Amino acid sequence: MKDTLKLYFVCGTVDCSRKNILTVVEEALQAGITLFQFREKGFTALQGKEKIAMAKQLQILCKQYQVPFIIDDDIDLVELIDADGLHIGQNDLPVDEARRRLPDKIIGLSVSTMAEYQKSQLSVVDYIGIGPFNPTQSKADAKPAVGNRTTKAVREINQDIPIVAIGGITSDFVHDIIESGADGIAVISAISKANHIVDATRQLRYEVEKALVNRQKRSDVIK
């Protein structure tokens, strides 16, 4: 799971002002994202049959590139189209209920603080998304930025749980994020609003891979 979190692209139609979401996602897939989440929220978000139809089209794209397709906070849609997994927040469906309904799917959980981490049923989730790293405009209900604090604190007590950082992340922050113990980054605007999506995605993937290699080298020296 940790390798799958290297470059996690989160996107919905409201995040794509320059191009159609299908074009955006396909370009990101071509350029090296490792996981995709369909997060369809906002005032102009698709609903009902339109949302289902879009999810199916995005799922087909992800299958073509062998990238897992995750749906945000809509377990019924996950079940309906047999998506690869579900991502939920602290105030969404309880994770034990999600696992009961999706025994063989990927389940991710958002965590912001150590208090949230400590109260979460981590035994039934496959990864946690920690953030927001920086203040972000992509989520209207975003919590205060936590930087690397929570990631570092979690890694001190849990070396095994897969962690992805999210929230206002650009390539400038990748090194510090990986050094703090994250296994990858999740981005929205850094890809969806980029002038050149392929170039932006490749740069992010390059920075993540470089940071992971450097971290492993330091770990090997310490051993």
From Swiss-Prot:
Q: Which GO terms describe its biological process?
A: thiamine biosynthetic process; thiamine diphosphate biosynthetic process
CDD domains registered for this protein in UniProt: TMP_TenI
Q: Any idea what this protein is called?
A: Thiamine-phosphate synthase
InterPro entries tied to this protein: Aldolase_TIM, ThiamineP_synth_sf, ThiamineP_synth_TenI, TMP_synthase
Associated pathway: Cofactor biosynthesis; thiamine diphosphate biosynthesis; thiamine phosphate from 4-amino-2-methyl-5-diphosphomethylpyrimidine and 4-methyl-5-(2-phosphoethyl)-thiazole: step 1/1
Pfam families registered for this protein in UniProt? TMP-TENI
Q: Which PANTHER family would you find in this protein's record?
A: THIAMINE-PHOSPHATE PYROPHOSPHORYLASE, THIAMINE-PHOSPHATE SYNTHASE
Task: Name the source organism.
Answer: Streptococcus agalactiae serotype III (strain NEM316)
Enumerate the residues binding Mg(2+): 73, 92
